A protein has these predicted regions:
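Intracellular loop-helix junctions on the cytosolic face of multi-pass helical membrane proteins
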Residues: 1-13, 142-143, 156-236, 271-278
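Linker/hinge segments immediately adjacent to helix-turn-helix/homeobox DNA-binding domains
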Residues: 3-4, 32, 36-46, 67, ...
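Transmembrane alpha-helix termini and helix-breaking/packing motifs in multi-pass membrane transporters
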Residues: 72-77, 155-173, 268-272, 353-370
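Intracellular juxtamembrane helix-capping segments at the cytosolic ends
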Residues: 125-139, 318-333
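Helix-turn-helix DNA-binding segment
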Residues: 407-465, 469-470
Length: 476
């Protein structure tokens, strides 16, 4: 099964790389823009006003994004109906805001213009982030992580080239990245129009009601509790490593880019193991310790906070996008976009709040290594508990998803053999998998299928897992 999983994963990655590049390239452009404006020290001098420092303006940007996401949540139906138009408006906000931030003259008289630019980038960034995230979530957890990994890798590669360009060219490129992002998104929307049409309405109302009733508590954990903890810890990390941006160290940008590269590797591994319980081990024994080591060792990084920040970014990026994958795993389609935007609101809002709360924390530390270590241990403990509690209950939701999909497939196949042929052709099932698939849709269990088809239990299990993987339904 390991070889089969790897082959399936490589096939998916190759298909996304060759057949749907505009989708992840759009996100890559957005990530590269974020790095240029808010995640590097390239333009710190332009993101500083008389009254506000760089990190305070970045916290404002995150807060505006959170407010915009909350507004999107209540008007999401209209937004999705006119997604391309909304993307163009959001890209315009992002472009104009970037121009104001990067090219506004220095001085107190122009501080208001720069703050308006930050607000506009928050409004535009939130809309594009939500639209891209929802599109990936509709593809399922594995495809979401594959797209994110590709986008992170390309963004890191692009940013590494950006570092060596002249300052004026850097400013121009970063300002134009929102235009590139929107153009790629609109092109991707046209390419995916048919596919998204097939997805819309694919889950019956009864199935949605059963799903949302049985998994309310788990949804609260995944959409509210876990993003809240991750966001707060992320914002606090930014404050604790604030010296990385203000010390003028040449290595901060390189460290951030390397962390983006490594994050793409971690997320690609998560996509490989998303169908099994190994994902829990990957989160609990890779991402959490990575963040933990960075937090606990922060006192030792007093002269090299950029190194601690890079380690934290690797762990938190793994958390950040695995939380996205959890939301994508809840496949009750009518409520998926709203759940995603709500979770994103909590995540971004908590990150902004963590950055604000980090101000008194940093002031109280007063270079006290022991106090910093205590704060670090508390954060790591909360992340560990939240991660284990959330991921360890993923099996319950997966079983509910299989029941929902099974009920829906039963209704589809009951219409006739022609409908079965459509499902088989759409998902590329083999002849034996088709036989197993038909019995599964009729509600038969593994034992019955083994006896009916005269095959071993292990063979039946293998066929079932292959079917679940092709249909993007996750079985334990």
């Amino acid at each position: 099964m390991v070889r089969s999983d790897i082959r399936s994963y490589l096939t998916i990655a190759k298909r996304e790389l060759c057949e749907a590049p505009t989708s992840w390239l759009a996100f890559s452009a957005l990530l590269a823009w974020m790095f240029g404006l808010y995640w590097s020290d390239l333009f710190v001098f332009r993101l500083t006003t008389t009254s506000f420092e760089f990190l305070e303006l970045r916290a404002l940007w995150l807060a505006v994004e959170a407010v915009a996401l909350l507004v999107l949540y209540f008007g999401l139906l209209r937004v999705l109906k006119h997604s391309s138009g909304v993307a163009v408006v959001a890209g315009t906000f992002l472009f104009v805001g970037s121009i104001l931030v990067l090219f506004a003259p220095s001085g107190f008289a122009f501080d208001g213009m720069r703050i308006v630019g930050v607000v506009l980038t928050g409004l535009g960034g939130a809309a594009l982030l939500a639209l891209l995230g929802i599109r990936y979530a509709r593809k399922g957890p594995k495809l979401l992580l594959v797209n994110v990994a590709l986008a992170l890798f390309v963004a890191a590669l692009f940013d590494s080239i950006l570092l060596y360009l002249p300052l004026d060219l850097q400013l121009m490129i970063v300002a134009l990245l929102p235009v590139v992002c929107v153009a790629l998104y609109v092109a991707s929307a046209r390419n995916n129009a048919v596919a998204e049409g097939l997805i819309d309405g694919s889950t019956s109302t009864e199935a949605v009601e059963v799903f949302t009733t049985n998994s309310t508590k788990i949804n609260i954990i995944r959409i509210v509790a876990l993003p809240l903890i991750v966001g707060l810890a992320y914002g606090l990390m930014q404050r604790l490593t604030s010296d990385a941006y203000t010390s003028g160290a040449a290595g901060v940008n390189t460290a951030t880019i390397v962390s983006f590269f490594l994050s793409s590797v971690f997320i690609a591994l998560a996509a490989l193991f998303i169908d099994s319980r190994k994902l829990i081990k990957l989160v609990c024994f890779a991402a959490i310790p990575t963040v933990g080591i960075a937090f606990v060792m922060l006192p030792l990084f007093s002269d090299a906070r950029e190194a601690a920040q890079a380690i934290c970014i690797i762990g938190f990026n793994s958390f950040y996008f695995m939380v996205w994958a959890l939301w994508a795993g809840d496949r009750a389609e009518p409520s998926l976009p709203k759940r995603f935007v709500l979770g994103l609101f909590v995540l971004v809002g908590a990150e902004s709040l963590g950055s604000v709360l980090g101000v008194p924390v940093v002031a109280a530390l007063d270079d006290s290594g022991s106090t910093l270590a205590v704060v670090s241990l508390v954060v790591v403990y909360l992340l560990l508990m939240a991660g284990i509690f959330s991921f360890d209950r993923s099996g319950t939701v997966d079983q509910e998803q299989q029941a929902v999909v099974g009920a829906e497939l039963s209704g589809q196949i009951a219409m006739g053999d022609r409908d079965l042929d459509i499902w088989v052709q759409r998902y590329g099932l083999s002849a034996r998998e088709t036989e197993v698939f038909e019995l599964l849709a009729k509600g038969r269990n593994r034992v019955f299928i083994s006896k009916a088809l005269f095959i071993s239990d292990n063979t039946t299990r293998t066929h079932m897992k292959n079917i679940y993987r092709k249909l993007d339904v996750h079985s334990q």
